[in-house]
């Protein structure tokens, strides 16, 4: 029997856990691993005998986020907690996303150790990346640029021109214009559900942005209600060319 009868139960519980558990000793040189559970072996593919005595950095690769690693180093130096997301590598060379939490603990003799809890979140991480990719594609669909002539394209806006949408629109148009040869961009506002002062200010900013790119901005589809809002900003938009419809604008270009 051990001095602590509960020890065997605790060890068995740790080895039944699906998460990886590591204990390191920062008071030894290079903070070596002194304990790993079965969950660690299952996640990484490394046997206990291969991991013990090593520093955890053997799981890292060239593309492991250096800033996240620095957070771990800082926590160890400060004897504090850290929560990080690391790209780690299994023994077979395949990568996995490791959601790692480290905590300082002390034994009865005030000897410092660190406990690390590993969770393989590769599936969740990949799902999040796919979701973000899909949202980006949806945003592009909400800002369609339609080539009309060799040097003219149309940007029809539908819905509302929020700050976030304006930011995305500016980035998307900038990227598009960098690869195109357009001299004119017709922005059609006939599909906008609302046109408040924030939208006008965004339009003023976009007008200035287009001037810098050398592309002339033409506005179409301004309703009488929108026109009343624009009057207050007439000085900022004095050089802006407007037409009632896209068809009317194309007669002059």
From Swiss-Prot:
Domain PAS: 6-79
Pfam family name, one: STAS
UniProtKB keywords: Chromophore, Flavoprotein, FMN, Photoreceptor protein, Receptor, Sensory transduction, Transcription, Transcription regulation
Signal peptide: none
InterPro entries: Bact_StressResp_Reg, PAC, PAS, PAS-assoc_C, PAS-like_dom_sf, STAS_dom, STAS_dom_sf
Keyword hit for Flavoprotein: yes
S-4a-FMN cysteine modifications at: 56
PROSITE patterns xref list: PAC (PS50113), PAS (PS50112), STAS (PS50801)
Domain STAS: 142-253
Domain spans labelled PAC: 80-133
Gene3D superfamilies, A to Z: PAS domain, STAS domain
Post-translational modification note: FMN binds covalently to cysteine after exposure to blue light and this bond is spontaneously broken in the dark.
Record-given protein name: Blue-light photoreceptor
Function description: Exhibits the same spectroscopical features and blue-light induced photochemistry as plants phototropins, with the reversible formation of a blue-shifted photoproduct, assigned to an FMN-cysteine thiol adduct. Positive regulator in the activation of the general stress transcription factor sigma-B.
Gene Ontology molecular-function annotations: photoreceptor activity
NCBIfam families: sensory_box (TIGR00229)
Organism: Listeria monocytogenes serovar 1/2a (strain ATCC BAA-679 / EGD-e)
């Amino acid at each position: 029997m051990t001095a602590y009868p509960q020890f065997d139960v605790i060890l068995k519980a740790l080895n039944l856990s699906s998460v990886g558990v590591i204990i390191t000793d920062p008071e030894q040189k290079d903070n070596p691993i002194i304990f790993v559970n079965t969950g660690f072996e299952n996640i990484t593919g490394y046997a206990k005998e291969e991991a013990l005595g090593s520093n955890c950095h053997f799981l890292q690769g060239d593309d492991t986020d250096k800033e996240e690693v620095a957070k771990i180093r800082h926590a160890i130096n400060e004897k504090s907690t850290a929560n990080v997301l690391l790209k780690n590598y299994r023994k077979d060379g395949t990568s996995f996303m490791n959601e790692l939490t480290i905590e300082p603990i002390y034994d009865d003799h005030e000897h410092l150790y660190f406990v690390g809890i590993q969770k393989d979140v590769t599936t969740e991480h990949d799902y999040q990346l796919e979701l973000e990719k899909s949202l980006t594609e949806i945003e592009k669909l909400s800002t369609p640029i339609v080539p009309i002539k060799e040097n003219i394209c149309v940007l029809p806006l539908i819905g509302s021109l929020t700050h976030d949408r304006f930011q995305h629109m500016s980035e998307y148009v900038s990227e598009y214009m960098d690869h195109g040869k357009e001299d004119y961009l017709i922005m059609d506002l006939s599909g906008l559900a609302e046109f408040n002062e924030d939208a006008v200010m965004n339009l003023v900013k976009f007008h200035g942005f287009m001037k810098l790119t050398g592309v002339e901005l033409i506005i179409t589809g301004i309703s009488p209600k929108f026109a009343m809002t624009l009057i207050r900003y007439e000085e900022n938009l004095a050089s802006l060319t407007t037409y009632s419809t896209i068809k009317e604008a194309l007669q002059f270009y």
